[in-house]
Amino acid sequence: PVIVKPDIGVGAANTWKLENDGDLEAFYDALPEIPYVMEEFVQGDLCSYEAILNASCEPLFENMTVWPTPIMNIVNDDLDLMYYTCPDVPKKLRDLGRKTSRAFGVDRRFVHLEFFRLTGDRKGLGKKGDYVGLEVNMRPPGGYTPDMMNFAHSTDVYQIYADMAVFDESRVPVSEDKYYCVYAGRKEGHLYRHTHEEILDRWGGDIVMSEEMPPVNWPQMGRFMYTARLKTLAEVRSFIRFVQTPPERGRQE
């Protein structure tokens, strides 16, 4: 299989997986007028490296975000979005993120670099657990992800960026109080085991954001969202299940 996507795109819009000759011919029969990129399909966990870089391309702030289900599948298969920011950045990803930023000569920017973490050995790409580059974005990640970084790291990335622009350094104290911050969306028309009231009753002490999203974000992020700050990955998974499990497959958490 291969993936085709616009050379300049946002949120996996007009991105498809082509699995056979018929898919390929159908794509070329209705070839879009804008430039497209075709790339090898890679099986792995989607992880991203975010950083605020100073004038010397050195990071003033770093973050890792994990996207269990790629946005392309969320949009094309009408799935619910869930993802989370992490309290720490693994050394392997941190080193790759820094090297990639330097290779592109990026300075005085907020960057969002995407990688696949291979779930199995892949000839020509790497071993299980290795990171494979997907795309580079010389901008922050979308949605409320910058706010999720703030909750995860007990910091203020907006102030760090402002400090970088004015002083070429961060003047925000580094906190040791770190968490996972998880986003779980709900789409219009989907059925769920737990009501809004039940979610707030169970997780209200951990929820830091809960609101209806702008309509433009509904295909990717869902109409309603819940964002929680949690200490363990097990809690993250339990929160996602509680928010998104449909009635027919649900069980009381």
Protein language model regions, located:
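Short, flexible turn/loop "capping" segments at secondary-structure junctions
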Residues: 6-7, 73-74, 217-221
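Short acidic/glycine-enriched loop/turn segments that link adjacent beta-strands
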Residues: 11-12, 44-46, 178, 220
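Peripheral (often C-terminal) accessory segments that flank ATP-dependent C-N-forming ligase machineries
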Residues: 162-253
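C-terminal structural cap/anchor segments
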Residues: 126-132, 138-187
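Alpha-helical scaffold segments in soluble metabolic enzymes
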Residues: 26, 99, 160
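Active-site nucleotide/adenylate-binding loops and adjacent lid/helix of ATP-dependent enzymes
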Residues: 1-44, 54-57, 81-95, 239-247
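Phosphate-binding core of ATP-grasp and ATP-grasp-like enzymes
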Residues: 31-35, 40-83, 91-131, 137-145, ...
